């Protein structure tokens, strides 16, 4: 039996505390308000004795328009969760120390983000770090005598410092690329500091990258998983792309470095000591350049997330083969520190590796990877022989191994369930067991639609996997308006994901059938399928979308006169392109943060390796046949003379990946052509919509637009 969370403690400032919510639901249909009331499970750590775990749950207040993270403990035998913290300040990153008697975590209770310590029962809270800068993350050495602290340092390579006598000046003098990244102007970089810990206080922090302008972890999404301690606590393996400015902007070549804490010496584990990179042309793809054809044993692409084997003999990490290709297949590279030999142990797995961890005996690794629209758990030995440990219609993410090595802890989600914590016993034919019931209230009181796997024949005779999500209380004798969901990435899987924005069940709850194709360019179907999108945005992947909607439209319960297409990022590009090429299939479009003009995108985005690889080169360079690259000659904005359908354009003005000018351009175009259109701008959001009230406004605007034209 699985127990629900109990022993909820009332905080001193109950009116300000954002915690677990059980709102009164108006019906059994998912609503934006219900979606934002759900808890979101974060980090999870098991105690050294394997009897309990500490984990974080983030809750959102629509009224206060902010989030708050709370710590819980979980009894791994009874499955009972107990709320551990009641502060109005968020706590996160919790881990056990002192044999499991104490928990260290991050909190901003003192006014800045610092490390705090408490007893395992939540008593005796005390601050143990007092750094001048905020601590973003941390990692204790196995002997707990040292700790890595991630803190920001000034970085003024691209944006120079203003004159000291102009402290109120807001202008920025920019001298190189990568002056902005994701949603931030780059004036600092995260660095790892190694500090001493005596069990009570943290001090004497030393910057591993002192004097270097590089970042570790890598921005914008890297975390403490990009660093690892050796089992003897003497070495640190860390991830770093030692480049700045334009060199950084065109390259995905990060490496794994080994740092000796006693001597301060650093060794690059990915390249020989005498390696010198060849000169590259910055404004065209690195695919066929010399950088991707080394004549020595070099790792040229993304190398990140190192983990030492428990016996200390090996280091494993995630490795991509090619520089400049951020969606290359991620392989598991294992380096034998005795022989200095590298082995890629997932070569026979025809998809990429997500998270991974070592077995207790150092003889195998566990990993997750997507295959045919589902992310399951696998095991590989050091010879590269792998097997599946789960085969569920779900998406798993590894959290770690139990101290005795007998259980894997993981999070599992699906299109019908947000993340919950599961345990997978590592014995023959064992099934994953659910440990948490964070959102049980919602699952007990809401009705979700059926999710069905459907294979569609493509124009070139191949098979395309689509997920079809039906409305709750589906009646096959009725006709339903139907949505084509266009995935972003452009090489991100349409797997069994749960999204708090692009949520399939909330679309179904509004009486829409949704078809979500794994079109050309998505992982989980082999390398040929994955790479048939690069340089050809408007080709087979667009035909795959049309094949999917045409196939489902033949069903008697689909109202083929009321079809819509929706999508974000590359999905937004897809919507803009389909608007001029759909042959009157659709009656409404919604594009979120999409690319409207590919030439505009090339010169506006910040990570230049991405358009170089996907578009082939800069728009001012010709392709090998002397023509303009196909991605530019088939840009969505070149088909606006054929636009004839109402369109909603949504964009965040802090989105530096795809600038909001794309949405403004598309909206202006539609209105000038007399087409009904609406523009939803978020001045304070990036590529995503993260604030509760903005999220609800997004959902309401989304469905008002669809209902207006499809119902």
Give the positions of each predicted feature.
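Cap/lid segment of the alpha/beta-hydrolase catalytic domain
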Residues: 244, 286, 430, 438-561, ...
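A short helix->beta-strand "capping" segment at the edge of beta-propeller domains
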Residues: 19-39, 203-213
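Predominantly five- to eight-bladed beta-propeller fold
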Residues: 17-20, 68-69, 152-211, 239-242, ...
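Short loop/turn segments that connect beta-strands within beta-propeller blades
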Residues: 75-79, 119-123, 197-200, 260-264, ...
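Short glycine/acidic-enriched loop and turn motifs that connect beta-strands
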Residues: 59-63, 109-112, 154-157, 243-246, ...
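Beta-strand-rich domains and repeat architectures in extracellular enzymes and scaffolds
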Residues: 33-69
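Conserved beta-propeller blade repeats
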Residues: 39-53, 88-104, 125, 132-147, ...
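Active-site-proximal cap/loop segments of hydrolase catalytic domains
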Residues: 503, 508-509, 516-711
């Amino acid at each position: 039996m699985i127990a629900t969370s109990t022993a909820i403690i009332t905080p001193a400032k109950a009116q300000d505390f954002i915690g677990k919510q059980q709102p009164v639901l108006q019906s059994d249909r998912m609503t934006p308000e219900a979606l934002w009331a759900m808890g979101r499970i974060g980090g999870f750590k098991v105690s050294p004795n394997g009897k309990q775990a500490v984990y974080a749950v983030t809750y959102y207040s629509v009224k206060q328009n902010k989030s708050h993270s709370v710590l819980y403990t979980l009894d791994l035998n009874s499955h009972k969760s107990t709320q551990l913290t009641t502060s109005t300040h968020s706590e996160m990153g919790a881990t056990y120390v002192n044999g499991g008697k104490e928990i260290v975590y991050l909190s901003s209770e003192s006014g800045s983000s610092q490390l705090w310590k408490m007893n395992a029962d939540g008593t005796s809270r005390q601050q143990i770090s007092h750094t001048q800068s905020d601590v973003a993350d941390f990692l204790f050495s196995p002997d707990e005598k040292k700790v890595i602290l991630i803190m920001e340092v000034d970085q003024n390579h691209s944006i120079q410092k203003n004159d000291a006598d102009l402290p109120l000046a807001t202008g920025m003098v920019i001298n190189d690329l990568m002056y902005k990244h994701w949603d931030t102007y780059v004036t600092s970089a995260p660095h790892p500091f190694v500090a001493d810990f005596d069990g009570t206080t943290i001090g004497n922090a030393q910057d591993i990258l002192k004097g270097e302008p590089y970042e570790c972890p890598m921005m914008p999404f890297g975390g403490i998983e990009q660093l690892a301690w050796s089992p003897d606590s003497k070495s640190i393996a860390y991830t770093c792309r030692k480049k700045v400015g334009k060199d950084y902007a065109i390259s995905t070549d990060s490496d794994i470095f080994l740092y000796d804490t006693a001597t301060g010496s650093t060794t690059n584990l990915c390249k020989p000591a005498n390696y010198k990179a060849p000169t590259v042309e910055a404004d065209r793809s690195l695919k066929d350049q010399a950088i991707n054809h080394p004549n020595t044993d070099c790792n040229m692409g993304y190398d990140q997330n190192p983990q030492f084997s428990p016996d200390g003999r090996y280091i494993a990490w995630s490795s991509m083969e090619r520089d400049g290709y951020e969606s290359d297949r991620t392989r598991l590279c294992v380096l034998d520190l005795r022989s200095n030999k590298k082995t890629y142990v997932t070569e026979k797995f025809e998809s990429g590796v997500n998270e991974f961890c070592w077995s207790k005996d150092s003889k195998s690794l566990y990993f997750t990877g997507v295959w045919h629209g589902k992310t399951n758990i696998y095991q590989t030995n050091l010879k590269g022989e792998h097997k599946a440990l789960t085969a569920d219609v779900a998406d798993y993410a590894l959290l770690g191994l139990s101290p005795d090595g007998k259980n894997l802890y993981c999070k599992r989600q699906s299109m019908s369930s947000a993340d919950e914590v599961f345990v997978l016993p590592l014995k023959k034919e064992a099934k994953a067991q659910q440990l948490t019931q964070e959102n049980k209230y919602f699952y007990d009181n809401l009705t979700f639609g059926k999710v069905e796997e459907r294979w569609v024949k493509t124009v070139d005779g191949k098979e395309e996997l689509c997920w079809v999500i039906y409305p709750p209380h589906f009646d096959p004798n009725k006709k339903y308006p139907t949505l084509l969901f266009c995935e972003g990435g452009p090489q991100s899987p349409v797997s069994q994901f749960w999204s708090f924005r692009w949520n399939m069940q909330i679309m179904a709850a509004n009486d829409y059938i949704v078809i979500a194709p794994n079109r050309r360019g998505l992982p989980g179907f082999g390398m040929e399928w994955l790479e048939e999108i690069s340089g050809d945005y408007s080709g087979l992947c667009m035909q795959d979308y049309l094949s999917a909607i045409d196939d489902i439209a033949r069903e008697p319960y689909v109202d083929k006169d009321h079809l819509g297409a929706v999508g974000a990022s590359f999905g937004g590009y897809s919507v803009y392109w389909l608007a001029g090429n759909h042959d009157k299939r659709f009656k409404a479009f919604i594009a979120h943060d999409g690319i409207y003009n590919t030439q505009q995108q090339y010169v506006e985005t910040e990570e230049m390796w991405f358009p170089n690889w996907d578009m082939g080169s800069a728009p001012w360079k010709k392709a090998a046949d002397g023509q303009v690259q196909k991605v530019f000659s088939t840009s969505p904005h070149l088909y606006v003379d054929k636009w004839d359908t109402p369109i909603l354009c949504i964009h965040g003005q802090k989105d530096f990946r795809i600038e909001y000018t794309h949405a403004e351009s598309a909206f202006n175009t539609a209105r000038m052509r007399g087409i009904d259109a609406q523009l939803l701008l978020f001045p304070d959001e990036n590529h995503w919509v993260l604030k509760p009230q903005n999220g609800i406004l997004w959902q309401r605007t989304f469905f008002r637009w669809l209902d207006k034209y499809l119902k």
